[in-house]
């Protein structure tokens, strides 16, 4: 067994919004990455969630923009005193896009599928602690855990835990059917995915009638598309060096947020000289994380102190333990011999 010590950098995400988008009932959203397929429960690709999460598919809970957790398909829940039982009450009147009813049986199917022995869910480890999923009645489902897990509600908000209908699984990678505010319409691979408003949505009706996701991988083409206003929004704009120009242009808004993306530089602590803790501490103090962020991402990023992004409930800021200090680094190397 070996141990890993890492340099951690949190990656910021920039979204550009054209002012003209605010007065339309349709929107064109540009993304750099195209999904490999459209089943968020069977691949690690974040590009799937970028298009489908909360738009087409929903989970029992969901993320807000600040990383907090709010009810999704579950309107409420109760947690037993020992932390082993979660009882979820589902919203009544929820239907899938094919008109069939979403109920506790669909929740059981989805979670059992995610945690099954043969599951290909990219986050399967998050759900293996669920020992049993029991349908109490059509609107009530009970989860029993093998041990308490304070992150369960957070884990259930991931795109990997969205609720799907058993009948839709065969074609889910090409024609996804969910419960969200938008329905899948069309996918022109290499170009775009089109969604339309779900008029039978159980929640607040969306203001938009149509949403188109365009895939533009080349930074130069991305810049040109924004400047020509061919797109209304570019989420995760791939060329941060262009952001000051957009910020100075009254046609656009630039929004900076956080992502689950971390840049991690790791070393093998079992091999000399890295098996010496003083050498590892010296390396940590020799690296200017902010300078890397400034150079590689033009300042759009955050030095982080754990393996989690700052909005994750498990995040602990330990950056003070490895602050950039060349003199201290040299002294530690001298002590290490």
Predicted regions and their residues:
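Surface-exposed binding/hinge segments that line
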Residues: 89, 123-164
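Aromatic- and charge-enriched surface segment that lines or borders ligand/interaction sites
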Residues: 75-120, 136, 142, 225, ...
């Amino acid at each position: 067994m070996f141990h890993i010590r890492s340099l951690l950098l949190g990656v910021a995400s920039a979204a550009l919004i054209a002012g003209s988008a605010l007065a339309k009932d349709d929107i064109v959203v540009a993304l750099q990455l195209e999904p490999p397929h459209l089943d968020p429960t069977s691949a690690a690709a974040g590009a799937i969630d970028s298009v489908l999460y909360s738009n087409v598919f929903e989970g029992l809970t969901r993320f807000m923009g600040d990383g907090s957790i709010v009810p999704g398909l579950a309107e409420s829940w109760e947690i037993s005193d020992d932390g082993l039982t979660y009882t979820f009450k589902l919203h009544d009147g929820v239907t899938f896009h094919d008109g069939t009813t979403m109920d506790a049986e669909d929740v059981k199917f989805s979670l059992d599928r995610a945690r099954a022995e043969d599951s290909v869910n990219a986050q399967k480890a998050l759900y293996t602690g669920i020992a049993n999923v029991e349908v109490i009645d059509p609107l009530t489902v009970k989860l029993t855990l093998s041990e308490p897990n304070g992150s369960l509600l957070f884990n259930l908000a991931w795109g990997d835990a969205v609720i799907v209908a058993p009948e839709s699984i065969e074609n889910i990678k090409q024609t996804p059917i969910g419960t969200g505010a938008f329905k899948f319409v069309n996918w022109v691979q290499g170009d775009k995915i089109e969604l339309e408003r779900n008029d039978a949505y159980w929640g607040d009706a969306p203001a938009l009638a149509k949403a188109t996701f365009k895939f533009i991988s080349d930074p130069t083409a991305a810049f040109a598309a924004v400047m020509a206003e061919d797109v209304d929004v570019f989420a995760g704009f791939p060329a941060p060096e262009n952001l000051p120009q957009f910020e100075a242009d009254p046609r656009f808004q630039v929004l900076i947020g956080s992502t689950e993306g971390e840049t991690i530089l790791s070393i093998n602590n079992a091999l000399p000289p890295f098996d010496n803790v003083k050498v590892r501490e010296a390396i940590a103090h020799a690296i200017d994380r902010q300078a890397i962020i400034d150079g590689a991402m033009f300042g759009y990023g955050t030095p982080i102190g754990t393996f989690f992004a700052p909005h994750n409930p498990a995040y602990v800021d330990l950056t003070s333990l490895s602050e950039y200090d060349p003199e201290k680094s040299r002294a530690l190397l001298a002590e290490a011999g």
